[in-house]
Amino acid sequence: MSNYLFTSESVSEGHPDKVADQISDAILDAILQQDPHARVACETMCSTGLIVLSGEITTHATIDYNVIPRDTVREIGYTSSEIGFDASTCAVLTAFNKQSPDIALGVNRSKEEEMDQGAGDQGLMFGYACDETPQLMPLPIYYAHRLVEQQAKLRKSGQLSWLRPDAKSQVSVRYIDGKPKNIETVVISTQHDPDISNGDLFEGVVEEIIKPVLPAEMLSSDIRYLVNPTGRFVVGGPMGDCGLTGRKIIVDTYGGTAHHGGGAFSGKDPSKVDRSAAYAARYVAKNIVAAGLARKCEVQVAYAIGVAKPVSLMLETFGTGKVSDEKLAELITRNFDLRPRAIIHELNLLRPIYSKTAAYGHFGREEPSFTWEKTDIAEQLIADAGI
């Protein structure tokens, strides 16, 4: 189709699934702070008045599994049962095991063999980049994130004091000949105090959240703003819906523009290629687009458990490449080492950097710790491509 609408959504840090993601990554960071080589797979479930932690953790770190979830929930803004959750009074249950020794066989390596550390599981991961925004992200998901980020900023600052933590956004963009033309529909659903009128809520969201974020030149003349379409959103957070780690994988990545291998990120240490290889694939794709070798680039990489070298590598530029996809795949092999330990080393992933990733997207953000967003290989790719 040469003329179509494409839609992406995001959710706020107060959405119950994102609460779970943030708790899982806060626990991961606390462990990595003490034990960078720990094996962590932390899953979180949160419901009314309850947080349940489970998974597999092998570490010598000593952390308080009761305090970290509460601190995370408190920072998000759930401090009263009236708004759906109370960090001070919620129950926290834990049920952790250690990593299976059968899995550890393929992952653990001596110092001399560490670059041959095997993948922690089989699987396929995708990375994507395009020239629709300066951050080389698809425009719909980029602005969907910025909208809920703005909602949280205004809520925490008190500028819109009637806002509550749970919120969702959705942005529909008109594409013509493969390029974004304008934004036609914006949906914002935000939790709110019960005494705010629909009129005041609509005006506050449109004037203070939407318009300051979206570029005016991208707004269509007949743009639709759908604000709390049901008319009321007082009950939210874990009281409104049960939250689970890893249930917002499209929000976390490219908003549906690119493929997804199915593996979630949060709560997983970087020996899990679900996370580290997806970051590396973004790094590869972004450098190709930053080099001007393609307007769009999707990279797939796949692994076998216990095996260091990827079992496959695929690249697609959707007809936008300056050179053939085969040539670009050759450049990837020459310039990027996609073995798990090499990824961890190149992107410096054994650090407590993951809590920031757990809301508002893992990609397209200008955070110094997001090393997979750097474009330091672009110049070398240009030179090797010979153009």
Curated annotation (Swiss-Prot):
User: Needs which cofactor?
Assistant: Mg(2+); K(+)
Provide the primary localization. cytoplasm
Q: Which GO terms describe its cellular component?
A: cytoplasm
Catalysed reactions, semicolon-separated: L-methionine + ATP + H2O = S-adenosyl-L-methionine + phosphate + diphosphate
Q: Which Pfam families match?
A: S-AdoMet_synt_C (PF02773), S-AdoMet_synt_M (PF02772), S-AdoMet_synt_N (PF00438)
Entry keyword Cell cycle: no
In the record, biological process GO terms are: one-carbon metabolic process; S-adenosylmethionine biosynthetic process
| Annotated function | Catalyzes the formation of S-adenosylmethionine (AdoMet) from methionine and ATP. The overall synthetic reaction is composed of two sequential steps, AdoMet formation and the subsequent tripolyphosphate hydrolysis which occurs prior to release of AdoMet from the enzyme.
What family does the entry list?
Answer: Belongs to the AdoMet synthase family.
Q: What name does UniProt use for this protein?
A: S-adenosylmethionine synthase
